[in-house]
Amino acid sequence: MFPESVPEGQRFRLTEEDRRFLYRYMSMLPRESVEPAYPDREAYPDSYVKLLLFGDSGDPITGHVRLFNKVGQAYGYLIDNAYVVDFEAGVEFLLTAVLQVNQNRIYNDDQYEYDEVGLPFMARLGRAVYRFELQRERARRPDLSRFRVHD
């Protein structure tokens, strides 16, 4: 996300086009995908892969908030690793959460509390940090222009 934070000799050799490609696909919502296409918005709502802030909602995500993230779900674990930006408010933050929702402690039994516990917790955690960041004093407004990769 921030190649300038790594010494030049240790960076991945990505072109500007490569970087924009990664930013675009890391922040893409299911409805924005062409290949593969996800036309069923009920089965694949915007929140399908955006657990922090939105995991408990089937509502569309507005264009001014973007999560550049990677999620995972397996064996009673949920993970979301996200760089969150709000283009209108000039807010940015990094947040990673790993949550175990396996009340019976039996793995591979498909008895996990993703919907009841995990997704609501992830969404509330993300919203709590987002609200904090909206109020936090900053010395300067971040330049988020390089992350505007969607029309």
Where are these regions (language model features)?
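Structured C-terminal helix/loop/strand segments within mature extracytoplasmic catalytic/sensor domains
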Residues: 1-151
